Amino acid sequence: MKLSRRSFMKANAVAAAAAAAGLSVPGVARAVVGQQEAIKWDKAPCRFCGTGCGVLVGTQQGRVVACQGDPDAPVNRGLNCIKGYFLPKIMYGKDRLTQPLLRMKNGKYDKEGEFTPITWDQAFDVMEEKFKTALKEKGPESIGMFGSGQWTIWEGYAASKLFKAGFRSNNIDPNARHCMASAVVGFMRTFGMDEPMGCYDDIEQADAFVLWGANMAEMHPILWSRITNRRLSNQNVTVAVLSTYQHRSFELADNGIIFTPQSDLVILNYIANYIIQNNAINQDFFSKHVNLRKGATDIGYGLRPTHPLEKAAKNPGSDASEPMSFEDYKAFVAEYTLEKTAEMTGVPKDQLEQLAQLYADPNKKVISYWTMGFNQHTRGVWANNLVYNLHLLTGKISQPGCGPFSLTGQPSACGTAREVGTFAHRLPADMVVTNEKHRDICEKKWNIPSGTIPAKIGLHAVAQDRALKDGKLNVYWTMCTNNMQAGPNINEERMPGWRDPRNFIIVSDPYPTVSALAADLILPTAMWVEKEGAYGNAERRTQFWRQQVQAPGEAKSDLWQLVQFSRRFKTEEVWPEELLAKKPELRGKTLYEVLYATPEVSKFPVSELAEDQLNDESRELGFYLQKGLFEEYAWFGRGHGHDLAPFDDYHKARGLRWPVVNGKETQWRYSEGNDPYVKMGEGYKFYGKPDGKAVIFALPFEPAAEAPDEEYDLWLSTGRVLEHWHTGSMTRRVPELHRAFPEAVLFIHPLDAKARDLRRGDKVKVVSRRGEVISIVETRGRNRPPQGLVYMPFFDAAQLVNKLTLDATDPLSKETDFKKCAVKLEKV
């Protein structure tokens, strides 16, 4: 076959990506340039991280056979990372689930039974009985759902409606609680609105990049390629990388900083002090657009109330703050001197000064990037607030090339978990369940009785685990997540509740994950392009894709499962009489009729789909379900700074960044000339706050919940690797990716290994106060911890590192700190 120059370039791009991971070019990638005329191509966002790369999906004879970077996608511009090139293979693992499985003994459900194939009707029969029993005997607080930042937008919206409006339970939370909750609360406290003000276009205009707890080289490799290009093409561009251990992003760093865990709070306050002491405040910006507040301190660690650390806290969980003067703020940060900071963090003084100078230099455009190092932190909200302080002091915000940017880890942690409001405390478009006006807006739009949505915040992720263990949460449905592997403190706080005979656990998943195997009922689930979907990425870009193949066997999408299950409940079975009396016309109706088959949702006919276009859910129901749900959801944000474009526009575009007003997307929010909500002459307006001003918070250093001591003498940090995504439930089923990194290892400093008579390749028992795992010693390679710290990825189901981690959370965001606990090592 003769190759065009473009095809040749594509083939080389595939080969280069594979070589980067030490792999040979797979047949699926070679299909990019082979037999193109026999392959049908369509666009989709990548299934993996929150970058939101665009890919072209090749289908042939009802299967996904190829994938390539979409050259028209503005995020990745035709390039994929190694995971992206192997997307087709995640769908065809040998153990793909194709029918519901229920634990049974002697022909009926039994908690100790074996998984047995059943029909969907049988599965829903059992679920219906369990839900109705729990609702009748103990009320809405006895049921719960754990969802995902991998849900499509309409799946998350449908789930939120079912639980908050249908079952009247706010006990629904996404796995984004474990990764982005601190970012959400940080945004809301400082700006009054969620999500970044900038976009990826900043990369090509920035003079300096500062990574705070973000290994972008492995976790956001496509963005890292753009940063690398910017750095290597411009000699005046600087890269600083801060972490508790050395990783691949350090290879590009001009200033690579290793600091003692938790002491990033000290560094952030030191930089603020440096800016003030060197008269580097942007006085015009600061005086017009900023307020100062002092936050409550000694707020605890989000542990059970009986824990000694919670009992000792003076202000457990307090989000309080009070106004303060500039002089008081200046005095507050003045304590964080260069000498004190160097002593507390272990960072050399010259490196600290170099870092501070980047922010203080008025001629340098600076972008701050962060991910889990900041967010998975018992003071993660504070860390977010403190980095905003630096940009607000200097006015380096909401303009091309400079600003703070919280990166996301999941493809729709922003678009679904945050914007839709699938958290236990949220509603669409930054509204919250505790606000009566917000509840009223939702109830009127959904045409349900006033008072239907509970005012009480539901159980967050870690609280759900505790409630299951305590027998207070009895029916639990998880979708699109593998929390038995990904969540903290498995032995003490998660597994006991899942296996408690009082509780019934449902897991919807394409594969038999650790979570699925611990459940009572497994529902086989369609994935990615086996359904029509939409994701929202880290730069506020909403992207759609069409269903391109059908799911295997009886696997069904999460959306189908939610909508069909809602048919099993009539309003009289879930709502009290006083609610029904307010809307008697809803008596006798099913939740399906009340929530999904409404005049507003069902008004878009199936005929809007192309004749040959797959859409299993809509064709079965007789109306364009996805469009109806999206347009209803989008109504909440339009006119309120969260404007989404009309549904059809997204199928034509490679994503659009909200707010989309008059057909135009927004690259930079809050600044005049860029944001349609900022009027001429206002300059900047942080319109999430009533007075249009952002907040600088005075917040101190406070120690970690657990630190090394004489017995447990090492810090443990957990995270990911390039080749695998999260718990590896998809990537470990790709043979090439599995071979590239087949099992987790314990990265350790050579001197720490030597002191314990350990050598590279030895088996080692890693022990915390909560559990133990056996791993393999690695003293070389990509991750190089300092003495006193070990690092272990969590993708390996055979090495459940979260048996070791502590379920301490940020008390404000309820996000778990997976980066800091104490362990000891024992040679095996």
Swiss-Prot record:
Post-translational modification: Predicted to be exported by the Tat system. The position of the signal peptide cleavage has not been experimentally proven.
EC number: 1.9.6.1
SMART domains for the chain: Molybdop_Fe4S4
EC top class named in words: oxidoreductase
Protein location: Periplasm
Cited PANTHER family: PERIPLASMIC NITRATE REDUCTASE, RESPIRATORY NITRATE REDUCTASE
Assembly: Component of the periplasmic nitrate reductase NapAB complex composed of NapA and NapB.
Identification of the protein by name: Periplasmic nitrate reductase
Provenance organism: Escherichia coli O7:K1 (strain IAI39 / ExPEC)
Lineage summary: Bacteria, Pseudomonadati, Pseudomonadota, Gammaproteobacteria, Enterobacterales
Gene: napA
